């Protein structure tokens, strides 16, 4: 019996029929992990690109808005800015959910006529994320510096304005946050206002029925357009 057991043991040790299956079982977790990590990294890169494009489109669109009068500088209205803000939500789509997962800050960088310094004339914000502008708040005097990262600041010319947009967004993992470091995506963009703009204020089209103002003390998620066309 002892000899029979040894014979069977030797036969088992020489048997190679299950090697491939064992190797597959051992290697599959590593291959699966690598595949999921690659998918997460690719999705993160795509979302990063999308947020960057949204920042550019917001700044570009906000620099173009206004009425079409040829007799005076173009006025801009709260409804114009609401359209720009809602347009970014539509462009981002449900996958991004821009205002539920992030925050947009639109600033009008101008030159103070009295001090000749750069200052933020007005800001409009939207989004649930608790984030304040990294470059200043409404009414802040910026001296001669302007807005933007150190040594890369943009400045406005006298009588003109620069629309500066910041987006701070929390990435929503496709698989798991453990595959990534920080989930925060930050993007900025700026465009000089295209036409001669009335820089005195942002107007209401109908003062008796004013449109919502997206002030930066509010933290509101994705916008909803009602059946009568009103914007919340």
Language-model features: where?
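Short, low-complexity, Pro/Ser/Thr/Gly-rich segments in the mature regions of secreted, periplasmic
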Residues: 213-232
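Alpha-helical assembly-interface signal, strongest on the long, hydrophobic N-terminal helix that forms
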Residues: 2-90, 107-109
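Short, motif-level signal for alpha-helix interfacial/capping segments enriched in acidic residues
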Residues: 1-2, 167
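Broad hydrophobic/π-residue packing in well-ordered secondary structure
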Residues: 24, 41, 45, 165-171, ...
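Amphipathic, coiled-coil-like alpha-helical scaffolding segments used for oligomerization/assembly
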Residues: 95-98
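Intrinsically disordered, low-complexity regions enriched in Pro/Ser/Thr/Gly and acidic residues
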Residues: 89, 100-193, 200-211, 220-222
């Amino acid at each position: 019996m002892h000899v029979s057991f040894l014979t069977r043991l030797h036969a088992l040790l020489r048997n190679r029929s299950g090697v491939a299956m064992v190797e597959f079982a051992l290697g599959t977790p590593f291959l699966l992990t690598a595949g999921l990590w690659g998918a997460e990294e690719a999705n993160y890169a795509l979302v990063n690109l999308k947020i960057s494009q949204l920042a550019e489109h917001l700044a570009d669109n906000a620099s173009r808005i206004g009425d079409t009068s040829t007799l005076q500088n173009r006025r801009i209205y709260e409804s114009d800015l609401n359209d720009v803000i809602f347009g970014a939500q539509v462009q981002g789509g449900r996958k991004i959910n821009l205002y539920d997962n992030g925050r947009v800050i639109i600033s009008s960088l101008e030159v103070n006529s009295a001090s000749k310094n750069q200052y933020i004339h007005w800001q409009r914000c939207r989004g649930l994320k608790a984030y304040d502008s990294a470059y200043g708040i409404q009414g802040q005097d910026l001296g001669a510096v302007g807005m933007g990262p150190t040594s890369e600041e943009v400045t406005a010319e006298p009588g003109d304005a620069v629309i500066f947009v910041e987006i701070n967004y929390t990435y929503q993992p496709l698989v798991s946050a453990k595959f990534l470091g920080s989930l925060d995506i930050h993007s900025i963009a700026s465009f000089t206002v295209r036409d001669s703009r009335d820089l005195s204020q942002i107007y209401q089209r109908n003062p008796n029925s004013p449109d919502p103002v997206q002030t930066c003390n509010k933290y509101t998620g994705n916008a909803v357009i009602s059946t009568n066309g009103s914007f919340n």
